[in-house]
Amino acid sequence: MRELAIEIGVRALLFGVFVFTEFLDPFQRVIQPEEIWLYKNPLVQSDNIPTRLMFAISFLTPLAVICVVKIIRRTDKTEIKEAFLAVSLALALNGVCTNTIKLIVGRPRPDFFYRCFPDGVMNSEMRCTGDPDLVSEGRKSFPSIHSSFAFSGLGFTTFYLAGKLHCFTESGRGKSWRLCAAILPLYCAMMIALSRMCDYKHHWQDSFVGGVIGLIFAYICYRQHYPPLANTACHKPYVSLRVPTSLKKEERPTADSAPSLPLEGITEGPV
């Protein structure tokens, strides 16, 4: 119980840091006159995939898949616990890393011009006249948090399904339905990332790098709890594969149980 409490505490701390960084102001990068065209895209009020919906998809999809697998395969509580710990760590680390990069880089969004100058008229001092909160949020383009969270949560779901379905083991290779089922979450993550470019909220580099960050954390945290996808036991977490200490002690040979040689018929020779 103590180890579990520590694991939960680490994740709570990471999510706390993520929420804290949401309210910090980013670096105010100088915008050169010759690059202002990059940030003159229209300011879209209604996103295709709002932030709340993105978080719901990224957090609830892996949890729902884990619960469905438990019902179908009747997995034990230990396996459920390991899966929850893995995906929660991936999401927490991803949030902290993405927000840290956002604050340090301070890249303007594609619609930054109209956040800064709502009337479309730029002054010579380049001083923004728009809402300060809207302007500050407009300096958090790189990397895309929509993309990173989508690929973190849904990317983990892909790894989890690939392990459960044995997509890359001898028994599962060549069965296309298994592969299609496993990569479906990644397809959804890609759609979320691309929607941010359609909303003029991110440049293509923002969505691409965000996706890479999310996928890296998803794989790292998955491998912390599960064996490689090519392993024959890839459907089980490491905890379930460990041999209990009591069994190890029973199997260990002792001096009393060591085999002895028959002594009958053996006579002492000259020394």
From Swiss-Prot:
EC main group: hydrolase
EC number(s) given by UniProt: 3.1.3.4, 3.6.1.75
Region (Phosphatase sequence motif III): 195-205
Residue numbers spanned by region Disordered: 249-271
Keywords: Hydrolase, Lipid metabolism, Membrane, Transmembrane, Transmembrane helix
SMART domains referenced in this protein's UniProt entry, alphabetically: acidPPc (SM00014)
Main location: membrane
InterPro entries given in the database record: P_Acid_Pase_2/haloperoxi_sf, P_Acid_Pase_2/haloperoxidase, PA_PP_rel
Pathway involvement of the protein, from the record: Lipid metabolism; phospholipid metabolism
Region Phosphatase sequence motif II: start-end pairs: 143-146
Residues spanning the membrane: 4-24, 49-69, 84-104, 142-162, 179-199, 202-222
GO MF annotation: an example: diacylglycerol diphosphate phosphatase activity
Record-annotated active site: H146 (proton donors), H202 (nucleophile)
SUPFAM superfamilies: Acid phosphatase/Vanadium-dependent haloperoxidase
GO biological process: blastocyst hatching; phospholipid dephosphorylation; phospholipid metabolic process; regulation of calcium ion import
Residues at the site labelled Stabilizes the active site histidine for nucleophilic attack: D206
Cellular location(s): Membrane
Pfam families per the UniProt record, alphabetical: PAP2 (PF01569)
UniProt keyword annotation of Phosphoprotein present: no
Start and end residues of each stretch annotated as Phosphatase sequence motif I: 102-110
Disulfide bonds: none
Reactions performed catalytically: a 1,2-diacyl-sn-glycerol 3-diphosphate + H2O = a 1,2-diacyl-sn-glycero-3-phosphate + phosphate + H(+); a 1,2-diacyl-sn-glycero-3-phosphate + H2O = a 1,2-diacyl-sn-glycerol + phosphate; 1,2-dioctanoyl-sn-glycero-3-diphosphate + H2O = 1,2-dioctanoyl-sn-glycero-3-phosphate + phosphate + H(+); 1,2-dioctanoyl-sn-glycero-3-phosphate + H2O = 1,2-dioctanoyl-sn-glycerol + phosphate
Record's function text: Magnesium-independent phospholipid phosphatase with broad substrate specificity. Preferentially catalyzes the conversion of diacylglycerol pyrophosphate into phosphatidate but can also act on phosphatidate and lysophosphatidate. Phospholipid phosphatases are involved in both the synthesis of lipids and the degradation or generation of lipid-signaling molecules like diacylglycerol.
Family membership: Belongs to the PA-phosphatase related phosphoesterase family.
Protein name (database record): Phospholipid phosphatase 4
Organism of derivation: Mus musculus (Mouse)
